[in-house]
Amino acid sequence: NNTGVDIMAIPFFSIDFKMSEWSSIFSVFLGFSSRSKQEKKLLELLHNRFPEKKITLFPSARMAFYFVLKNTFKTGDEVIFPAMGFPLYVKIALQLGLKPVYVDVEDEHFTIDVEQLGTAITANTKGIVVTHLFGYPCNMDEVMKVSNKYDIPVIEDCAQSYDSFYKEKETGTFGYAGIFSC
């Protein structure tokens, strides 16, 4: 290189999967029957893990969130969101004609600030979305107190909290709906 510009070599990494791992990866891209087998396995695992819950699989957490919002709220309803979360969920709410209301997050784990949650409730508030961010559960005791006091459903965004627990109870099992992603 005679341009006087240093060029960094981009390292090449080998992806070293076992044959069984490649088989699993490729089965996702094969026909419906292969996916159907994988879906059945996943449903069985989830039913064993959450025996008291109704499980529905979606192609993405976004689609699940859309489905829950569309079938739970109506145009003009206010839904509380944490100020820090997945921005696309707010966009989905807006597309459905819902009115997002933001509640700030607490300083330690950046989950919804439960001290501010109660003051954000109005007569038009019809839902609360909480995000268990970075594997840290929200203070679900306080969230559910507000939910029960005002009879408002809680939707838990658990995309970052699979296998996380709040006081020995798994995230996604407190509210009206828990949405996981893998």
What is each stretch, according to the model?
Residues 60, 84, 133:
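Flexible loop residues that form catalytic
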Residues 45, 55, 71, 92-96, ...:
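Alpha-helical structural signal in soluble globular domains
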Residues 57-58, 81, 127-130:
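A short beta-strand submotif of the Rossmann-like class I SAM-dependent methyltransferase core
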Residues 52-54, 58, 105-108, 168:
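Short, acidic/glycine-rich phosphate-metal binding loop used to engage nucleotide
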Residues 56, 80, 101, 153-155, ...:
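Structural detector of well-ordered beta-strand residues that form the stable sheet scaffold
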